[in-house]
Design a protein with these regions (language model features):
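Conserved N-terminal glycine-rich FAD pyrophosphate-binding loop of Rossmann-like flavoproteins
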Residues: 42-67, 107-118
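Residue-level detector of alpha-helix initiation sites
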Residues: 18-19, 184, 280
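Residues that mark the start of a beta-strand
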Residues: 11, 33-34, 198-200
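Glycine-rich loop(s) and the adjacent beta-strand/alpha-helix scaffold that form part
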Residues: 27-30, 34-59, 240, 245-246, ...
Length: 293
């Protein structure tokens, strides 16, 4: 099927609207660019996205029994959120080698998995960046914790992350709001660990519990994507499944998408394309974009 051309060309295309897509859209839009965000799933209201109990429990039972969420149910967030925020495995199947099973948890809606993640925001340390070299499995990353520190700081301040600076090399300190108070159960655990093991209990590094209507700050819609939209320079297009990139030599010059509702294809050109479709989906798009891979 020949892809139709759009009526206007954005300055940048961001593929994916989750945690990374929201940040990319915000940075580009606030820099003055016209940004088009493409999301494979629907654009839900906060009420639709989060649902309510006991309806969410009924959905879990029905979707597991029907075989739609037999793998997705293993994600911890499946039991805390609306299960409809996880993909239907019958419509989105995947396979793995028998000796190497892999749980691929996916969310296809505006906001992506920023609607279902646990909200724990830890900085990677040099233990992670140099793990392969230390274990004799190859070279380490060409960057380290210090290189990313300024960007971690900007995000921690933007997202209003709570936590404490504990001085641990394997858990780099950040710029946090004061730690959230411990629950009675956590206080008891802290006392037992200190008394029996002589170890401190580290406060969680994450977000305050969201209550009330609207989007939580831990979600793309509650922070970064909201700021991108507020510029008036960001358009979010839902139900747009990106098939592949359009290439000019070794440079991307646009994308071809499929409308999941109609099956029609469309070509959109842009001088900048940012892939934020999650690790595996981003790799699929890249591999599908060139016969030579």
């Amino acid at each position: 099927m020949k892809a139709s051309a759009p009526t206007s060309q954005p300055d940048a295309i961001v593929v994916g609207s989750g945690a990374t897509g929201g940040v990319a859209a915000m940075v580009l839009a606030e820099a003055g660019l016209q940004v088009l965000v493409l999301e494979a799933g629907p654009d839900l209201s906060s009420r639709q996205a989060f649902g309510s109990e006991p309806l969410n429990t009924a959905r879990r039972v029905a979707q597991i029994a029907s075989g739609k969420k037999r793998l997705q149910r293993h994600h911890p967030g499946f039991w805390k959120h609306n299960p409809s925020l996880f993909v239907d495995e019958q419509r989105n199947p995947y396979s793995t080698p028998d000796d190497a099973p892999f749980l691929w948890s996916r969310g296809r809606q505006v906001g992506g998995k920023s609607l279902t993640w646990g909200g724990i925001t830890l900085r990677l340390s040099d233990y992670e960046f140099q793990a392969a070299e230390r274990d004799g499995q190859g070279p380490g990353w060409p960057i380290g914790s210090a290189d990313l520190a300024p960007y971690y700081t900007r995000l921690e301040q933007l997202l209003e992350v709570h936590g404490a600076c504990d001085g641990l090399p394997q858990l780099p300190d950040g710029h946090f709001l004061p730690p959230l108070p411990l629950t009675p159960g956590e206080q008891h655990l802290q006392e037992c660990i200190g008394r029996d093991l002589g170890l401190p209990l580290i406060s969680s590094r994450g977000f305050n519990l969201h209550r009330g209507p609207g989007w939580p700050r831990s979600s793309s819609q509650g922070c970064t994507l909201a700021r991108a939209r507020a510029t008036g320079r960001t358009q979010v297009r839902s139900n747009a499944v990106v098939s592949h990139l359009l290439l000019d030599g070794d440079q991307a010059k646009g994308v071809v998408l499929v409308d999941s509702r109609t099956g029609s294809q469309e070509r959109i050109d842009a001088p900048l394309v940012v892939l934020c479709a999650s690790t595996i989906e981003t790799l699929r798009i890249l591999l599908h974009s060139s016969e030579t891979h």
